Amino acid sequence: MSEEVIIDIIKGDEPQAIKPQENLIIYGVNGKPITGRTPNQKKLVEAFAKNDLTFALGPAGSGKTYVAIALAVKALKNKEVKKIILSRPAVEAGEKLGFLPGDMKDKIDPYLQPLYDALQDMIPAVKLKEYMETNVIQIAPLAFMRGRTLSDAVIILDEAQNTTTHQIKMFLTRLGMNAKMIVTGDMTQIDLPASQTSGLVQAIGILKNVEGIARVEFNKKDIVRHKLVQRIVEAYEKHDEKVRKASMSKKHEQAEKKGEE
């Protein structure tokens, strides 16, 4: 790390525009380099550089959102964009905003806390507060994006598997000039009612051959949390596969019985 970067961190200021270095995205507030640690994290870094819209798909703990936010912070620090916009659909685990206590900020914050946590790792507290107060960094639920054109920005939609088909189309068509989007999601964690199609699932199918759009698939090998998390994910994958096979077997038996009648 350069002497200039260390001085900036001690003073609570941002490091100056980041010089290219292998695998480095940015330095965190503690001076620790934030890099693409796994092959798929590195693919996300490359995809972001080459495309205006990137889908990052995979399990919890694989670093897809953290790396996406680091890329946005780097673009802001290097003055490639003027703002960062982070969003999530405000429906998770069966909860809706209308049923949460408190005023709007109190209702929204629990959904957006993971995004705050990542930013706090990357931007000194005083500077982050300034960015938030001046709307250089904006964090809002997806519904707040309607009617806006998002230019000169990096825009990240997290937990996109919980968008409806209308919501994700609305979000993707907000893209303005000199802007890039990263859409993250985990197809195995859809919390929408069973009758609703995930907007992310539909969008991936519709946009798979569109120029300027990339798709990066993460997997359990990318999980960078506690090593137990990877084993938990593997156990659930095995369980889900058993359930899927049992369901297929039952359907096959029912079809055979109908054929005999």
Residue spans for each PLM region:
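Polar/charged, Gly/Pro-rich intrinsically disordered segments
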Residues: 25-26
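Conserved helicase motor core of SF1/SF2 NTP-dependent helicases
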Residues: 29-157, 161-261
